[in-house]
Amino acid sequence: MDGFANGTWSSPEDLCDDAEQKANLSALCSLLRNLSLEARPLLRQPRDLLVILLYGLVVLVSVFGNALVCHVVFYSRKMRTKTNVLIANLAVSDLLMTTLTIPLSASRFLLDNWPFGEALCYLAPFLQVTFVYVSTLSMAWIACDRYSVIVYPLRLRRLCPSHRAIACIWTLAGALSLPHAVFNRVVSLFTYRPLVRCQVQYPPPPAEFRKWLTLATFITQYVLPLTLTALMYSRVSYALWSRKALGATTREQQAWHTRSKRKSLKMLVLVVLCFAVCWLPLNVYHLVAHFRADDGPDRHNSSLFIFFHWLAMSSVCYNPFIYCWLNNKFRQGALACLTCLLHCTHRRRLHQSLMKPASLASRGQSAKRSSTLRSTSVGSTNKTTSV
């Protein structure tokens, strides 16, 4: 769930769009639109700068961190375990959301118009909701996989391979996200100047349809996957803290196996908790806004909505730090990648610095040759003239 899925546009114009469906207030709404558009360049300038700074920081950190996670997993064959491949799938989803939808979401807070065309008006909310579904479904699948490995280590594992699991996750996420793509429309608003907006137009009655779609998305995208994940991890925690490790012959081996699995479990649980905390305020905001009895204008507090939206989008940044903090192999792989990157950059700069004196020397020699040739030609010309 996010602003795309619900068509949230925190401005007086959108309040007017809701009001015009309920009462004949077109004159007042036209006045509100004109006043808001005239005052916006002055009133929103500090907020716009803050939006650009915060969302830009999210994009930079997420692109660097999630690309690093994908590199660590796919570069080393030892890191391509089933859990790590699903973690990389989660990183790919976060990376795609960062590059494809977060800039569009931020632009809706900054621009009066929708300059991206009708195709992106349909595609942007679909991709946004799909990527969130992929995140929650991936976390639930990882939890089920850990449950089958730790709670029943001697039982034949019946979960499908990682590539099939990823295909199932993306297919189910896309199917569940379809309702958020079919109702978007590019509409024209005529005030003192024409505007183009990407808005959601639900079938009648639109208010009721939006309520139940919001509730259904909240349950399938947030409540059910995270509840299943919590149940699986609670059972896994009980198993880890109450029995000895299988196959360990000494106390030191038992302690090492148990400590390793507990640390891995802490990492996965922290990833889920971080996601849940980041997305809970925005989901509650949508539910309260759509189910409140009094549908007044105070529910559209744009600054509050932007903060909740930014908090939800920032969830794409934290996982790489959690992996490097609680997983030694991830940390070693990330350090090796960064060391190689810095070393290659240093070698490139050193090569360029060594090439500069040589190029300057060659330029100096060519200049001397040209001046010598020029002086020789002048001397020969003077001799010819004197003769």
Short names for language-model regions:
Residues M1-L42, T191-Y192, A245-R262, N328-V387:
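Intrinsically disordered regulatory tails of 7TM GPCRs
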Residues V63-F74, I102, T130-P153, A165-A167, ...:
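Cytoplasm-facing ends of alpha-helical transmembrane segments in multi-pass membrane proteins
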Residues L31-P41, F109, N113-P125, V129-T130, ...:
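Loop architecture of class A 7-transmembrane GPCRs
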Residues Y55, V72, L96-D112, P125, ...:
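Helix-to-loop junction signature of class
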Residues R47-Y75:
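First transmembrane helix
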Residues Y75-V85, R146-A165, A230, S234-M267, ...:
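Intracellular signaling interfaces of 7-transmembrane GPCRs
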Residues C198-Q201, P205-P206, F218-Q221, Y238-C278, ...:
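Intracellular effector-coupling site of seven-transmembrane GPCRs
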Residues R44-G56, K82-I142, S148-L159:
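Extracellular TM2-ECL1-early TM3 structural module of rhodopsin-like
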